[in-house]
């Protein structure tokens, strides 16, 4: 039985010509203690529905999936409420890619380029303290004129900065739900020609099969050897093992 350390979740849409509603595949991907990434679930459902995600997570739990250390995904999903019910001990990391787009959508185009740089300054900071300072600076700069943008950012503050408590070698992978996004960009391209002749079940089955093929070519997670330490509860601060910091200080 594999031990799943990190999981990524997303709702992936693929339009079907025969139906008005778009198929949403609720996707969960995980990385095990050996650094191998796998699809854990590709299920039909409603992205914003807690019930849909609850069913997905309960199915995974019934199959014996352990409590993951960290879950990564977009904030605008029913996934998070379901996760708190089914795997309440799992830490949460909001996807910086989705959050950046959502914040910028609350701003006029004239300030978006500068605001994007300010957002990047947060997650690119080497320490959580520096990230907090950049976070505060963004809020102070844009709150007076654009309160919707700053509220969008501020409401997920803790969950946006969770990655600092995990190995720095993993940051690139755990800051966003890009592992799912990039894979499904390819799958979406492959299923495009078949949309007119597939049912919802047929499309879902095809996505699942293409997903299985895709994962055969995935590389192991960068810095996978740190996963064992994450599992055993080794503490990390600003991406560095706490004992290492203490030894250097001594």
Provide a role label for each language-model segment.
Residues 17, 81, 105, 185-188:
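Active-site-proximal flexible loops/turns
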Residues 121-250:
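Acidic/histidine-rich catalytic cores and adjacent linkers
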Residues 33, 43-44, 50-53, 57, ...:
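A detector of single, family-specific signature residues
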Residues 61, 65, 84-88, 108, ...:
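Hydrophobic/aromatic-lined pockets within catalytic cores
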Residues 1-19, 74, 93-96, 102, ...:
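Conserved, well-ordered core segments of regulatory domains
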Residues 2-5, 24-26, 38-41, 51-58, ...:
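Conserved phosphate-chemistry cores used by DNA topoisomerases
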Residues 1-73, 77, 81-82, 86-89, ...:
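RNase H-like nuclease fold core
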Residues 70-77, 82-118:
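Conserved beta-strand -> loop -> alpha-helix junction used to position metal-binding or nucleic-acid-contacting
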